[in-house]
Amino acid sequence: MEDITEPEGGEVILRSRQCGHCKVAECVDIGVMDFEKLVAFAGEQAIDLVVVGPDDPLAAGAVDAFENAGIRVFGPRKNAAILEASKAFSKDLMKKYNIPSAAYETFDSPEAALAYLETAPMPIVLKADGLALGKGVLICSTREEAKEGVKTLMLDKQFGSAGDRIVIEEFMTGREVSVLSFVDGKTIKIMTSAQDHKRAKDGDQGLKYRGD
């Protein structure tokens, strides 16, 4: 692997606890949600650009914190990160602007969700509304699986408050492709498409997993 610690006279510093990262960059052990310490560190080190990757700090306003301190930062602000942080918000937004997506219903109570499942067609997809480390989506083949999924998300709180609200969505087949675009308010730059193979095991088996 190419050494990127000093590209063209610069330096890469990662907020990371993963030992593999430390082979290619300087790593600092600061909590990813400790914005005060992260902002202070960036200021002390005269960091030219901060790139925020993980979902949780983006949703909590990490980019806003760096911007408020006058530090250049790449990533969506809190009011934009909600597109990832709330599936219900995203689905409602797509519905409002007629952006095609799978049919859905949103539920705040397990009783209402279970009642809906009595007549819903199977298979069906259950999604925790909030962030769940890439694991909050359940594809259920039978009504029994779907009911157990509601229990897992809303009653057992397997993903904490992320499951306080759930989205029950139409099951669709086909290839899933991600296309990212960078936008500055005036210009859109579309990146190369990519596929995220989310299952933990080969052959589309196992639970969904974010891959780290």
Spans of features found by a protein language model:
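ATP-binding N-terminal substructure of ATP-dependent carboxylate-amine bond-forming enzymes
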Residues: 1-78
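Short acidic-hydrophobic, aromatic-tinged amphipathic segments that line or gate anion-handling sites
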Residues: 27-34, 105-109, 140
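A conserved helix-loop-beta module that forms one wall/lid of the active-site cleft
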Residues: 74-136
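Conserved ATP-binding module of the ATP-grasp superfamily
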Residues: 100-102, 123-125, 140-178
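Short beta-strand-to-turn element immediately C-terminal to the catalytic PLP-Schiff-base lysine
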Residues: 107, 137-142, 181-184, 191-192
